[in-house]
Amino acid sequence: MALTASKKRKLVLIRLVFRVFDVIPLCDKCATMQVALSEIETFMCDYGAHHSLVIYPYMPLIIFDFDNCLAPGNSVGEDILLPLFDVIESDKSNDLTPSMRQEMRLDFWRKPLDYIVEKYKFSKHSKSASYAYFSQLSIAHPIEGYEDTHLVHAFEGVKILVTSGFQKFQHSKIRQLGVEGAFEDIYYDDPGNPPRKGKAFYFDIIAKKYNTAPSEVWVIGDSEESEISAGNSLGMKTVQILRPGVKKSPKAQFHVSSLQEFLSLLQMS
């Protein structure tokens, strides 16, 4: 019987258990799971009567997005960007129709700044003003996430947060949402710190740091162009969370409407 990736991982863990207790397993790396399970059953019968043996379950590696995954993009309050909108919309060098202005304002809550600058062909003045504005931006008041945001603390395994945006602003949002302590590491794909590396760069670092095969890494977020695309490019398990206003993407391997659904998906995997 051929071993799948997950079964190979379990077999490695079983072999480590034997090594810890100075037991030499009879099976080699090509053995089937049936042989391995038979070994450990015999071992536990001999060992368990005299010792306490704890075998820990497989713990997943999960990469979370932040905006529109754990908190709405506009959770900070839309008034915070009004001064910047005034600068951009009063710049005569920007050829923005009323409908484009409306769409641009919406994009600021769901797209990274460099994408917006390119899409709407900002003048040098507006581009410079936008980067300067975001580089100093932060919030000092609590923000609200979704009804299920608190569940991020309930996920077992190694949880990593990778977010796009200016680090000072993003960090203040994460802190004010109260989820900073849920993660082992936080990475910022900061457009204000060129060259922009992209999320795939950080995803690859994470998989290597935690010695996890890409096919065993879970990625959850809302954006097809960002985390879903990055995860797919590395062969990771991509999950699109369909928060209000998020368009369902066929590129994601899985779709959930809430963190509770994602939690159930993990438990069944």
Tell what function each PLM region has.
Residues 135-161, 200:
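Short, acidic loop-to-helix structural element flanking the phosphoryl-transfer center
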Residues 24, 44-47, 52-60, 160, ...:
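Asp-based, Mg2+/Mn2+-dependent phosphohydrolase catalytic module
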Residues 31-34:
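Short polybasic linear motifs
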Residues 6-9, 15, 38:
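Low-acidity, Ser/Thr- and Arg-rich intrinsically disordered low-complexity segments
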